[in-house]
C-alpha cells in the first residue's frame, strides 16, 4: 500500500456570506470523507486580506486552490458538486482503474461500431 498524499489547499471566500459558508461546509465534508485528516486547509477572506487574493490572482469567490500534491489546480465557483470537486482535486480520476476508465469512454454508443 502506498503512503497517502498530504493535500495542501486554500479556499478563498468573500466575507461571511451564505455562499461562502456553504462552500466551506461542503468542502469540509468532502475533505473529512476523502482525506481523513491528511490535509491542511487555509481559508482566506479576501475582504480582510485583499493582498493575498491579488498575489494569487484570485478573480472570483469561492475559489479552491490545491497547492500540493502537484499540479496546482483551481476550482472556481460552486463547490456543492462533490464529483466536480473530486475531479478538480485529481481524486476521482485516481480512483478509476485503467480498464474502468477505458470502458467508460469506449462504450457510451456501441451502435457506432456497425
Curated annotation (Swiss-Prot):
Signal peptide: none annotated. InterPro entries: Circ_KaiB, KaiB-like, KaiB_domain, Thioredoxin-like_sf. The keyword Lyase does not apply. Coiled coil: none annotated. It holds the Pfam family KaiB. GO terms for biological process: circadian rhythm. Keywords: Biological rhythms. Belongs to the KaiB family. Component of the KaiBC clock protein complex, which constitutes the main circadian regulator in cyanobacteria; it may modify the ATPase activity of KaiC. PANTHER family: CIRCADIAN CLOCK PROTEIN KAIB2, KAIB-LIKE PROTEIN 1. Has 2 forms, fold switches to a thioredoxin-like fold (KaiB(fs)) when bound to KaiC. HAMAP family: KaiB. The kiaA gene has been eliminated from Prochlorococcus during genome streamlining. It has been suggested that the central oscillator in Prochlorococcus does not have to be as robust as in other cyanobacteria because the former live in specific niches of the Earth's oceans; they divide exactly once a day and at the same time. Thus gene loss and changes in kaiB function compared to other cyanobacteria, can occur. May undergo a major conformational rearrangment; in the free state forms homooligomers. When bound to KaiC switches to a monomeric thioredoxin-fold (KaiB(fs)). The active oscillator complex is probably KaiC(6):KaiB(6). This is Circadian clock oscillator protein KaiB.
Amino acid at each position: 500500500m502506498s503512503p497517502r498524499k498530504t493535500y495542501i489547499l486554500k479556499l478563498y471566500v468573500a466575507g461571511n456570506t451564505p455562499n461562502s459558508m456553504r462552500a466551506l461546509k461542503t468542502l469540509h465534508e468532502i475533505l473529512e470523507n476523502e482525506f481523513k485528516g491528511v490535509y491542511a486547509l487555509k481559508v482566506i477572506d479576501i475582504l480582510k486580506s485583499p493582498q493575498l487574493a491579488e498575489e494569487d490572482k484570485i478573480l472570483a469567490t469561492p475559489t479552491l486552490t490545491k497547492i500540493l500534491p502537484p499540479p496546482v489546480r483551481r476550482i472556481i465557483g460552486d463547490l456543492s458538486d462533490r464529483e466536480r470537486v473530486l475531479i478538480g482535486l485529481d481524486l476521482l480520476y485516481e480512483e478509476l482503474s485503467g480498464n474502468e476508465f477505458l470502458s467508460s469512454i469506449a462504450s457510451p454508443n456501441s451502435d457506432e461500431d456497425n
